[in-house]
């Protein structure tokens, strides 16, 4: 499990008042150098939680360059070793937002065939599905499960194109597949 950082999402009354703040959407480990983070502290970043990298990438996040340095470098290097974090953030932000309409919706996402997608990509059929090992796995909070064949028709891809490029380039995500854990 990972935490995600989209900035401070709560007001002084600890009520969620925004979806995100800024373009830095990162995925962090839950424990790092003894740091503890409260769940809804005003004026501090508000942690959100992800089952694994596939969920985090599909939500538009990238690995943190501090607590997940090796994963961040692998992600970046799989796209372009010369790419700076700020440029990655701008690319992902542009892929998350639909100009004039706000956040991109699942219906706005690109259609790709399953054979064009790398393992670790999340698509939508009758719900979110992880492409892994030549099969689509259904989502649950316990992990990805119930593999089924990849359909021949185009699939709506939730994972942003930049993260698909990282997966295609060799980034190996942490996946929670029921019956296996790949790290």
Model regions and ranges:
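Mature, structured domains enriched in cysteine- and short glycine motifs
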Residues: 1-183
